[in-house]
Curated annotation (Swiss-Prot):
HAMAP family documented for this protein: His_tRNA_synth (MF_00127)
EC number assigned by the record: 6.1.1.21
Pfam families from the UniProt entry: HGTP_anticodon, tRNA-synt_His
Family: Belongs to the class-II aminoacyl-tRNA synthetase family.
Main localization category: cytoplasm
Listed name of the protein: Histidine--tRNA ligase
Alphabetical list of Gene3D superfamilies matching this protein: Anticodon-binding domain, Bira Bifunctional Protein, Domain 2
Gene Ontology biological-process annotations: histidyl-tRNA aminoacylation
Record organism: Synechococcus sp. (strain CC9311)
Subunit structure: Homodimer.
Reaction it catalyzes: tRNA(His) + L-histidine + ATP = L-histidyl-tRNA(His) + AMP + diphosphate + H(+)
């Protein structure tokens, strides 16, 4: 019988990795709490029409990458490929927008059928932020600052913010016509994928990874030059606010996002921590999406970061700076106390002691092997705990434990349970 394995692009998170994820999520939660954001959780499975209407049928995500199937009711369903459309659907369905502007965050798995590679799987995880009902340039700057500060606190070095304006729908339509005309005159110089996009989603050609196409685009028209005065003024306000916040940025007139709902501010944050520039966060403004999904005209802006890519960057940062914030996030936590126990009386008492001390807030690991004291001491040392509590039948009869330091200097103490607990509470 063949060994059961995960599907390609689906990855198990083992305990060591899960601890790192939890550490990152904990930092993110605290940032969001301080910024007044509320968490929202949406289903993994949605009607396909949500993403076809929201993301855009001409996008690679909808056209090539979604996990879509007919359920037993003959309804087309899709595993969510991103979080924004689902958050907007939930806000509309439950009337959140009638309560005023919403500052929301989400986290969880997404699914796209694409080639698996380091930091990019078919089931991947995102943490995202959505400000619904936020119209001012200040909101753009605040959202970007929230991402920048979170990544900085995670200990990531070499951050680079690239920003662009995609303008209004009229701006983009005007630019699209100019770009298509320019590219059609040079269509034979485009790579095959870009040639296909010329008729379906020409703005995505600006994001081509083909080196020949990239070189050709150096002379192409840019969207920034096609913006209306109002769009230019708005973008300049966003840039001025970022400067005031001392967040460095670079203008990237080729920056477009892969989803059709973006307009005005678009941005990506990359890091050179992996050697090459790797995108760790991306987002932008999507003022037309809520109306497109059946709601009122509502401005909105948000971002998402990919956890798999982020954890690769954090691991690289930890190696580069063993004393930095990233290293602390990736460190394996150790118990404060390792309980070594053996004997007919001692073993049930050890279980009771561990339970009591855990209830007091101590991290206590209990050896449940009944192995020799020598073998248990070796396991205690490997656990990383600074203290071992030894409980044999002799100690059990006396209502005491032996408290032995496992790290550094110190003498073994024989104490009652209560005195040992009081002593350890002071050592935390």
């Amino acid at each position: 019988m063949s060994q059961l394995q995960t599907l390609r692009g689906m990855v198990d998170l083992l305990p060591e990795q899960t601890r790192r994820w939890q550490a990152v999520e904990s930092v993110a939660r605290e940032h969001f709490r301080c910024a007044g954001l509320d968490e929202i959780r949406t289903p993994l499975l949605e009607f396909t029409d949500l993403f076809a209407r929201g993301i855009g049928e001409g996008t690679d995500v909808v056209g090539k990458e979604m996990y879509t199937f007919l359920d037993r009711g003959d309804r087309s369903c899709t595993l969510r490929p991103e979080g924004t459309a689902s958050v907007v659907r939930a806000a509309l369905q439950h009337g959140l927008l009638s309560q005023g502007a919403q500052r929301l965050w989400y986290g969880g798995p997404m699914f796209r059928y694409e080639r698996p590679q380091a930091g990019r799987q078919r089931q991947f995880h995102q943490i995202g932020v959505e400000f619904l009902g936020a119209s001012s340039p200040r909101s753009d700057a605040e959202v970007i600052a929230l991402a920048w500060d979170l990544l900085t606190d995670l200990g990531i070095q070499g951050l680079n913010l690239e920003i662009n304006s995609l303008g209004t729908p009229d701006d983009r339509q005007r630019f699209r016509s100019e770009l298509v005309q320019w590219l059609e005159e040079r269509v034979e110089q485009l790579d095959a994928e870009s040639q296909a996009r010329l008729t379906t989603n020409p703005l995505r050609i600006l994001d081509s990874k083909d080196k020949g196409t990239q070189q050709l685009l150096n002379d192409a028209p840019t969207l920034l030059k096609a913006l209306s005065k109002e769009s230019v003024d708005r973008f300049e306000q966003v840039c001025a606010l970022l400067t005031a916040l001392q967040i460095p940025y670079q203008l990237n007139p080729r920056l477009v996002r892969g989803l059709d709902y973006y307009g005005h501010t678009a941005f990506e944050i990359t890091s050179d921590q992996l050697g090459a520039q790797a995108t760790v966060c991306g987002g932008g403004r999507y003022d037309g999406l809520i109306q497109q999904l059946g709601g009122p005209v509502t401005p909105a802006i948000g971002w998402a970061l990919g956890m798999e890519r982020l954890l690769l960057v954090i691991s690289a940062a930890a190696q580069a700076d063993p004393d930095g914030a990233a290293a602390r996030l990736t460190a394996t936590p150790s118990p404060l106390v390792y309980v070594i126990n053996r004997g007919e009386q001692a073993e049930p008492q050890a279980l009771s002691l561990a339970r009591q001390w855990r209830g007091a807030g101590l991290a206590v690991e209990l050896d449940g092997s009944s192995a020799s004291f020598g073998k248990q001491f070796k396991r205690a040392d490997r656990s990383g705990a600074p203290w071992a509590v030894v409980l044999g039948d002799e100690e059990a009869s006396a209502g005491q434990v032996r408290l032995k330091p496992l790290r550094g200097e110190g003498e073994e103490k024989q104490l009652t349970w209560e005195d040992a607990l009081s002593y350890l509470m002071k050592q935390r």
